[in-house]
């Protein structure tokens, strides 16, 4: 073997290694939320009907209403002149029903316009948040005042509005004004809605985990979810009709489906499945957690649609918090039930 001689120059050219770097979980940030939001917007735009066909349908509906009113008036005149009192009574009833129907259509149209105005306010708030720091906050102030008018004028809302106005300064830009508005005015409402969502999610989870009848579970949970969305809309001062409520449900459910809520529920169910419980108890508890998470997801999406100002960074409710609450509630409920059954059989 040939002998090798190392010189000082060769030693200096050795590779220098950098010290080891350690990263904590807090330093890792996932970029999934913007992608999910972008996907939801694309889906929502693709599912919107054509403006031409919508206007054509509304025009045909208005023409039908006018024709119905005109026909009922003509029927009233003809039966009155012919002294046909029985037919006249039917004509009066038909005229009243026609007026009620046209009034209901006008009321639904007005509430649909209100829902569209609400979404326009959300877009305006998004634009105000994207403005540069050197812009004036006067436009944001006027926007926030218009939002307060649509909220339910409770003593709490009036108190937090006064506190918000007392903290304003002429030097604040739009983003700072909206931040103060969210912290002072909308934050108490957000907390109430979050408690409402957590309560309904936990109750639905217990219903599914304890009840042995699947059909009854589905019907009861569906009814409770509809009531939950109605309570959320009232909390933010939204007045919805039948059609506008259906439209809101369609948007919420569409975003829920494409956001992969069922995948989240199954993952959490599998995590809980590994707990030291019996197989039967774990399956029922996992089903309850899955349904509770779907309820929480529905409530959070409805909250995002109903909130007049879009959520800023770190304001969006986290599904993981609801998950931990659900696991704790179900553990306590299922363990207490198992303990009662054991004591019952032991005493007998």
Swiss-Prot record:
List locations, semicolon-separated: Cell inner membrane
Q: Does the keyword Cell membrane apply?
A: yes
Q: What is its main location?
A: membrane
Q: Which GO terms describe its cellular component?
A: plasma membrane
Keywords, A to Z, come to:
Cell inner membrane, Cell membrane, Membrane, Transmembrane, Transmembrane helix
What the record says about family reads:
Belongs to the UPF0283 family.
Please identify the protein, giving its name as recorded: UPF0283 membrane protein HAPS_0079
Provenance organism: Glaesserella parasuis serovar 5 (strain SH0165) (Haemophilus parasuis)
């Amino acid at each position: 073997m040939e002998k090798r001689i190392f010189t000082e120059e060769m030693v200096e050219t050795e590779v220098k290694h950098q010290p080891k770097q350690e990263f904590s979980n807090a330093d890792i940030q996932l970029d999934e939320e913007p992608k999910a939001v972008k996907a939801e917007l694309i889906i929502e735009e693709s599912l919107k009907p054509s403006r031409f066909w919508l206007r054509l349908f509304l025009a045909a509906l208005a023409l039908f209403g006018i024709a119905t009113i005109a026909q009922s008036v003509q029927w009233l005149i003809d039966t009155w002149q012919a002294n046909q009192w029985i037919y006249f009574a039917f004509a009066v009833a038909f005229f009243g029903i026609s007026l009620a129907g046209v009034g209901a259509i006008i009321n639904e149209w007005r509430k649909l316009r209100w829902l569209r105005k609400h979404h326009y306010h959300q877009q305006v708030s998004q634009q105000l948040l994207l403005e540069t720091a050197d812009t004036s906050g006067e436009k944001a102030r006027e926007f926030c005042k218009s939002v307060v008018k649509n909220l339910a004028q409770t003593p709490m809302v009036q108190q937090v509005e006064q506190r918000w106005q007392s903290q304003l300064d002429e030097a604040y830009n739009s983003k700072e004004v909206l931040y103060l508005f969210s912290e002072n005015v909308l934050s108490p409402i957000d907390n109430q809605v979050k408690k409402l969502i957590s309560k309904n999610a936990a109750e639905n989870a217990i219903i599914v985990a304890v009840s042995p009848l699947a059909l009854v579970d589905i019907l009861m949970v569906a009814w409770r979810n509809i009531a939950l969305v109605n309570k959320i809309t009232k909390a933010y001062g939204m007045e919805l009709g039948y059609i506008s409520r259906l439209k809101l449900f369609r948007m919420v459910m569409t975003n829920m489906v494409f956001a992969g809520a069922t995948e989240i529920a199954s993952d959490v169910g599998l995590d809980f499945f590994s707990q030291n419980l019996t197989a039967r108890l774990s399956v029922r508890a996992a089903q309850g957690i899955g349904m509770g998470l779907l309820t929480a997801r529905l409530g959070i999406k409805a909250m995002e649609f109903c909130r007049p100002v879009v959520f800023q960074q770190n304001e969006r409710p986290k599904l993981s918090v609801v998950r931990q609450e659900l696991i704790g509630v179900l553990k306590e409920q299922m363990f207490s039930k198992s303990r009662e059954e054991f004591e019952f059989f032991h005493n007998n």
